[in-house]
Every structure is written in C-alpha cells, then in structure tokens.
Amino acid sequence: MPCGKCYYCKKGLYHLCDDENGFLEGGFAEYMLLPKNALIHKVSKDIPAVEAALCEPLSCSAYAVNQTGMGMEDTVVISGLGAIGMGMLQFAFLRNPKRVIGIDTNDALCEIAKKLGAAEVLNPMKEYVTKRIMELTDGVGCEIYMEATGNPASA
C-alpha cells in the first residue's frame, strides 16, 4: 500500500513508494485486510469478473506500449505472448507499426497471435529467432523490443 507521503506518492508514482510495507500479498484474493488509507478501486458489479481480471494486465500492456514512442516505421518484437504480451500486441496495432513479430515457446499462443494479426510469430525452441528477425528486416533488426516473458534469459 502506498504511504501517500513520500516523494513518489506525492507525484502519483505509487508503484515507486519508499514505504517498506508497500507490497501486500493477496492482490487477486476474494478478500484482503487493508489499512483504512489504502487506495481502493471498486469494480462495478455490472462488469463481468473475467473482464475485470484483465484490467491489471492490460493496463500494464498499454503503459508499456505508450512508453516506447512506437510509430509507423517501426518493427516491433514482442517476446512472451501471455496476457501482457497479447495486450502489447493489440495496443501496438493501434500505433500502426510497420510490422509486429511475436515470440513464444507455446504454439497455441503463437497461433492466437497470428490470428490477431502478427506479421510473423517465432518459436525459439524451433528456430534461431535473432537470425529470422534479421532476415525479415533485411538485416536491420527491430526498433522496439518488448519483453513480456518474465524470464531474464529472454531479454
């Protein structure tokens, strides 16, 4: 829970709060015990739980894409096609980049990314991804690489 008093909280950057008790377990639990000064966003009962559950990963995806400054001439590579990566894929399309390439080891997720419009989807267990990206971009590579696997080895 952000303290609301430190430098970062005063700037609205609650995720950088200096308070050592800033992170509590159970964010996706049905019930949680919170301090009375906690920032709480109540989800309306008319929003289905499945849709409400996507608010957090999609907000992360939107924020990440917005931070890139992505434009129409960019080749974008998104590594990791789970909820956050698929969100990045969709938000990237709103920026109309030159091409979006997805990377994942899960063939089912690769197929979904293709159906959503990825120009190419690569599986690092089946091909040398860097070489293939260089082939697809005439040796240029990508302007924007977005990591959504959570695996340090993929960065």
Model-derived segments and spans:
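N-terminal Rossmann-like NAD(P) cofactor-binding module of classical short-chain dehydrogenase/reductase
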Residues: 146
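Short beta->alpha connector loops
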Residues: 82, 150-152
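Conserved amphipathic alpha-helix within the SDR
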Residues: 129-139
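Mid-domain Rossmann-like dinucleotide-binding core that forms the NAD(H)/NADP(H) cofactor-binding site
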Residues: 48-127, 131
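Rossmann-fold NAD(P) dinucleotide-binding segment
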Residues: 141, 152-155
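NAD(P)H dinucleotide-binding glycine-rich loop of Rossmann-like/cofactor-binding domains
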Residues: 2-79, 110
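Short glycine-/small-residue-rich Rossmann-like dinucleotide-binding loops
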Residues: 1, 149-150
